[in-house]
Structures are given as structure tokens and as C-alpha cells.
């Protein structure tokens, strides 16, 4: 019976363990489905955030495009103004040259006329009168003919010069406009390129920081896993020792069962039973069998635990190896990125420096060419007007052609540099895309399900990613029927591991999504190997041409005795001075604007103070009129209301009117009495209407007084606001003055220190004095303009103040007239009321 009970108990325990195992398995599957649902939700949230981010980026891009369009329009207007100024200057110079040439021709003709007159006078003195007259007429005719011919020639030359000048001006405007448009486009593209490079640098730095943080995080995870592995190994060793001890005890028990008469068998009986008899053998045997079964169960449990720990140890070691492999892959991935980023930044800096050098050299060469042409034109004087016209036209055409060729070369060089930069950027983006695809393929691969042998059979569980150890360990661990603190600890560790793995996966997924979005924004098209080879060959040819041209220009400058470095330093100093002068002008304009605003605020403040003082004085002089407006009650006449307000309650106006009607219809009265009654009734109705009008005007005046009081309060509030704004403007003006002083000090230091000896050699003392005098004149001019503007603003404000005062006086006069009318109406109404009340009393 005992054996059947034990077997049934064992079967019941086994069924309970199986049920617990199935329940744990179902719980884990439910948790797995919850985690998958959460992952899908997170993916949807990430996609939503990406869409919002793309919308924000699109809005920012549209805003930037709008800003650039506004800037382009402003630049176009500025360029048009500069072009018109230059054309005006060229036109004035050409007109002056033409006037000088005309004066020279007129002087030549005057000299010729004087010579002819001298000849005529000589002939007149030497010969007879007929000869004199003939010669005089012939000379006059010849002079007229020559003058007419010269006049026609001069007119033709003038018309030709005007047409040529018009053509040259049109060509010059077209060329300058195209040049400025292309220069603005190149400048904008260059700035965009610089912004793109800075953005790529920042993104690379962020990516490197993120990778370093991930490496540190994974190192910490590896360290934690190694520590857990050591703990589990110690626990397994301790369990192994317990198993060996239990095996020894089991072997001793079995030997005691085989040899019942041995002293080993007697020792436990003596120790356990004392002085027992020989008939107690069967209970002892039953106890030994129970102990043996218990030991076997414990041994089986310990062996299962050892197998689980060994499997967990193997899984942890595999996971550690995988993490180490990922760390190495991440290091190998971001090192080429760093190298490539450094190479690209160096290449970009070299290209920008080369572009600046080429621009400076082009400017200097064009300037030198212009100076040489001017010198050649000065040396080679024209023999006539036609030669002068032809030489000027040739010089202008040659200069324009040279300028067009130089600008075309500069545009070609800049476009090729931009193409190389775009090619490098596309190569970098292609490498990023390939690495991203490889990483996605690696992340898509999932590990196979882990099969673990347990005490009751085999348990198979599949994990979400590569972390199947915690789930399988939880399913196997449910073999232990009693729940111990070790079980709780292991469950907590497994939950923490799953949460940690889930967080890692979400972080990696978000990082991949960000990288994918950035790649989608940056990648603009596919690459072509032939195009790459062609662009490389073109770049090499352009570099060789540019080097040859630079060498030729340096040789030409060396022949002219110019030093390139000195020219560059001179140009840099000139640019610095121009920048400082522009800053000073900007600050002075800002100062003028602030002064103007401060003056406006002061004027408005004074106006409001004056208005408030006038209102206070008027309130102090004239006491406030207290209008007690009694609203009309429906069904009551104004006379009745006024009588009740005055305290006369005996008279009822409606009854009085009825009585007057009755008296008017009474036949006993005489005609005169009836006429008097009718007139009294009409006068009463008119008085009632008049009183109603008075009440309406009184209400309107009361509303107007309320409006004036509210306006007074508004003026006081505006005064407070203007006081605050005036203080703020004063502070801003002080700051602007300080900034102007600082800029002047900077300019003075730049002129004194940075130029050094070369500036001293360039500028003589006379030129310095001239410069100082010009600066002083400019300052005086600016101050005079500011004073004139302040005076004009003050005059305008005074006119506005006078107009406001006149308006206020008119309103006050109107209010006083209305007050007088109200008083007169009140007096008339009182007189009428007394008259009719007296007449009614006498009549009754």
C-alpha cells in the first residue's frame, strides 16, 4: 500500500509539475506576444515621428528658400543701383571728354579765323579796294565752306560717337549684369557647399559619439555577463560538490543494505533507535527505501540544475562572443568613416583656399591689365578725333573681351570644383548606404531555437532576437516544485535581461531609422564609373592649366617688379579697412535711427504730459458737472418725470392735458379763453418734446465726458509706456555709442598696428593728413545731416502738436457751448414750468 501511495504521489507531483510548466510556457508566450505588440507600436510611433520630422524639415527648407529668394531680390536691386551709378559716372566722363575736344576744335578754328583776318587786313592795306573786296569775299566763301565741311564732319563724328557709346554701354550693362548674376550664383553655391560640409561634419561627430556610447554600453554588458557567468560557475561547482557528497551517502546506504550484519549498518540503528529488538527490521528497511528515493530525487534535480547551468553558461559565452564581434565590427566601421571625413575636410579646405587664391590673382591681374592699358593709352596720343574714337573703342572692346574670358574661366573652375565636391559627397553617401544595408541584413538574421534537456523531457523555445537563454531557462526552471528565493532572483534577472535586450533593440532600431532618413535626404542620384573617370581627367587638366597660368602670372608680376605677397597683404588690409568703415557706417545709421526713435518718444511723451496737464488744469478750474440722468419710464411723459425729480408730485401731466382738452372743447368758454387753453396745451407738448431733446443731448454729453475720461486714462497709460520705451531707447543709444567708439578704436588700431611698416611706406604723411581731414569732413557732414534731420523732425512734431492743441481747443469750445445750451434750456424749461403751473393754478 505504501508503494502504491508513493507511486500515486509521484505521479501527482509529475502532473502538477507538467501543469506548472505548461502554465509558465503560456505566460511566456503571452509576454512574447505583448512584447511583439509593443514593438509594433514603437515602430508605428517611430514612423510617425519620422513623418513629422520630414514635414518639419520640408517647412524649414521652404523657409530657407524664401529667405534666399528675398536676399536674391535685394542683391539684384543693389547691383542694379551700382550699375546705374557706374553708367552715370562713365557718361559724365565721356561728356567731359567730348566737351574738351569741342573746345580744342573751337580754339583751332578761332586761330584759323584770326590768321585769315590778318591776311585780309594785310591785303586790304596793300591793294586797291576791289582787290580787297574780291579777296575778302573769296576768303569769306572759303571760310564758310571749310567751316560747313568741318561742321558736317563734326556732327557725323558726334553721331557716330553717340551710337558707339550707346552700343558700348549696352554691351557693358549686359556683361556686368551677367557677371554679377553668375558671381552671386557661384557665391550662393559656395556658401551652400560650406553649410553642407559643416552639417556632414556634425553628423559624423554625432555618429561617432553614438558609436562610442554603444561600445561603452556593450562593454558594460559584457562585464555584467562575465560576472554573472562567474557566479553561475561557482554555484555549479557548489552543486557538484553536494552531488558528490550525496553519491557517497547513497553508496554507504546501499552497502549497508547489502551487508546487514556489518558495523556500518548497526551504527545508524544504534544511533537512531537505541535498545531496539530484532523484530523491528521491516520499518527500518522502509525508512532506508524512502531515504534512497529522496536522495535519488535530489540527485536528479541537482543533475537537471547542473545541466541547465551548463547550457546557460554556454549561451552566455556565445552571447559574449557575439557582442565582442559586434564591438569589433562597429570599430572597423567607424574608423574608415573618421578617416574619410578627415580626408574630405582637408580636400574641401584645399579647394576653398585654391578658389580664394585664384580669385585674388584674377583680381590683381585684371587690375594690372587695366592699369597697363591705361598707361599705354596715355603714352599713345591720338592724332585726330577719329583715331581717338577708334583707340577708345578698341581699348574698351579688348578690355570687355578679356573680362569675359577671365570670368568664363573663373566660372568653369568654380563649377568643376563644385562637381568634385558633389562627387565626393555622393561617394560618401554610397558607402554609408552599403554599410547600412549590410547592417540591416545582419540584424534580420535570427538565431535558431534552443533545445534543452530537462528532467521531464525536452523543452524547445524560440527567442525574439539572439536572447533565447533567459526564456528557455525560465521554462526549464519550473521543474522545481517548491518556490525558493533563488527562483525569484533568477526570474528577476531574466526579466531585467529581456528588458535590457528590448531597450537595446529599440535604440538600435531608432538609430538605424535616423541613419536611413539622413541617407534618403542626402542621396540625390546614382553614380557612373565613366563619368567619374571623365571628371577626374577634366580636373587634372584644369589643375595643370591653372598651375601653368599661375606660373605665367607670377612671371609677369616678377617682370613688372611686383611682389605677390605684398599685394595680397595690401589687399587684405584694404578689405579690413573697408569692413571696418562699413561697420562704422552701419553703427552710425543705427545710432541715427535710435536717436530718431528716442526723439519721437520724447516728443510724444511731452505731448502726452502737456495733454494731461491741460486736462488736470481744466478739471481743477471747472468743477465737474454731475449729470443725474433719470431714465424715462414707459408710459410717463418727460414733464412728469422732471416734476417728480423736482419734488412736485401733486401735478399729473396726463390728467392736466386731458383737462385742457376738455376746457378747449367746452362751449361755455369764450373764444379767447378757448384759444388760450389750446395754446397752453400746444406749448406743453412742445415743452415736453424740448425736454426730451434736452435729455438726449444730456445723455450724449455724458457719454462724451466718459469717453474723454477714458481717453485721459489711455493717455496716462501711453505716457507710462513711452517713458519705459524712452529709457530703453536711451540705453540702446548709449550701447550704440559705445559700440561706435569701440569700432573707431579698432579701425585706428588696425591702421596703426596691422599695416606696420608697409602701410607707413604706402601712405605718406601728406596722404595721412588728407585722410584725417577727409574723415573729419565726413564726420562734420554726418553731424550736420543728423542736426538737420533732428530739426526737421522737431518742426514736424511741433506742427503736429499745434494741430493737436487746436483740435483740443475746438473740442473744449464745443463742450462749453453745449454746456451753455444745456443751462439755457434748463432755465427756459423752469420758466415755462413755473409759468404753466401758475397759469393752471390761477385757472383752476
UniProtKB/Swiss-Prot annotation:
Changing residue 795 to G: In a breast cancer sample; somatic mutation. This is Janus kinase and microtubule-interacting protein 3. Residues 466-483 have a biased composition (Polar residues). The gene is JAKMIP3. The modification Phosphoserine is found at residue 384. Residues 269-282 have a biased composition (Low complexity). GO terms for cellular component: Golgi apparatus. One of its GO terms (molecular function) is microtubule binding. Residues 254-268 have a biased composition (Basic and acidic residues). It is found in: Golgi apparatus. The keyword Transferase does not apply. Residues 250-290, 466-489 are annotated as: Disordered. Residues 8-258, 289-421, 493-621, 683-834 form a coiled coil. InterPro entries: JAKMIP (IPR024836), JAKMIP_C (IPR031994).
